[in-house]
Amino acid sequence: MRVAFFGTPLWAVPVLDALRKRHQVVLVVSQPDKPQGRGLRPAPSPVARYAEAEGLPLLRPARLREEAFLEALRQAAPEVAVVAAYGKLIPKEALDIPPHGFLNLHPSLLPKYRGAAPVQRALLAGERETGVSIMRLDEGLDTGPLYAVWRTPILPDEDAVALGNRLRDKGVELLLEVLERLPELTPRPQEGEVSYAPPLSKEEGRLDFGESAEALYRRHRAVQPWPGSYFFHRGRRVKALRLRPEPGEGEPGVVARVGPEGVAVGTASGLLLLLEVQPEGRRAMPAADWARGYGVAPGTRLGQV
């Protein structure tokens, strides 16, 4: 089929790569270049870089309602459009152009976790199961009818990166199957509990030792790679790069044990073992080395700004 693809981050690149191997990608649409790096120089998105490298037609419109963009989409004449983490709602003027509409690969069991951060929100909530949905877009936020759904348990140590990639890879399989049979398929309306998944804020990476160790571990897994988890020591931010919960008791926020493996901190329930950290302005290091270098010992209180 003639396919237009809408996507932006690195997560979406394998979706585009799989599509172009099975279908004719007549247009790639990504978000405009954004300032990146220390120099804040405008740089293309990962999807835009891939499209340029592969010689695919590429547009980076600031507004999808602009007539110039809509006309370019009409001229490309896609039979269907596919969306994977594009980052903007598609207006009706564009939705009506492909005869078979717009399909969206969404990493949740819709209607749960509609929005920008479904993988992260599922982990934060402690969900035991999630999945991926292939849906037809309408004007709402992930409200359209479903073509296919795949369910899976969330693995005990899976973070947002690993889970998101696993859901995407299965989603690609489902998407290709749907495209093969699209003219004969009828999507079904979403049913069940509706919830939303707004983008993460930087503050949501902060570890509050007043929560349980299990809840903190869920938070750590959910906020990878951004904003990452962190706490404060002597008023300075310390990134928590690797950690795990373990049995034990201790006062929340107070170091209970320092050993070769790491630094055990008390929480509301259980201990949180810090394995690798990165103090503000310094390199990453084993938590045991950080404790020696920064005077962290049993009884030290963490978390205070």
UniProtKB/Swiss-Prot annotation:
Under InterPro entries, the record lists:
Fmt (IPR005794), Formyl_trans_C (IPR005793), Formyl_transf_N (IPR002376), Formyl_transf_N_sf (IPR036477), Formyl_transferase-like_C_sf (IPR011034), Met-tRNA-FMT_C (IPR044135), Met-tRNA-FMT_N (IPR041711)
Q: What chemistry does it catalyse, as a reaction equation?
A: L-methionyl-tRNA(fMet) + (6R)-10-formyltetrahydrofolate = N-formyl-L-methionyl-tRNA(fMet) + (6S)-5,6,7,8-tetrahydrofolate + H(+)
| Top-level taxon | Bacteria
Q: Name one GO molecular function term.
A: methionyl-tRNA formyltransferase activity
> Gene Ontology cellular component?
cytosol
Please report a single Pfam family linked to this protein. Formyl_trans_N
Q: What is its EC number?
A: 2.1.2.9
Residues that hold (6S)-5,6,7,8-tetrahydrofolate according to the record = 108-111
* UniProt keyword annotation of Hydrolase present: no
Keyword vocabulary terms for this entry:
Protein biosynthesis, Transferase
Query: Is Protein biosynthesis among this UniProt entry's keywords?
Result: yes
> What Gene3D superfamilies does its record include?
3.40.50.12230
Q: What class of enzyme is it?
A: transferase
Name the family: Belongs to the Fmt family.
* NCBIfam families in the cross-refs: fmt
Report the function annotation for this chain.
Attaches a formyl group to the free amino group of methionyl-tRNA(fMet). The formyl group appears to play a dual role in the initiator identity of N-formylmethionyl-tRNA by promoting its recognition by IF2 and preventing the misappropriation of this tRNA by the elongation apparatus.
According to UniProt, the name of this protein is Methionyl-tRNA formyltransferase
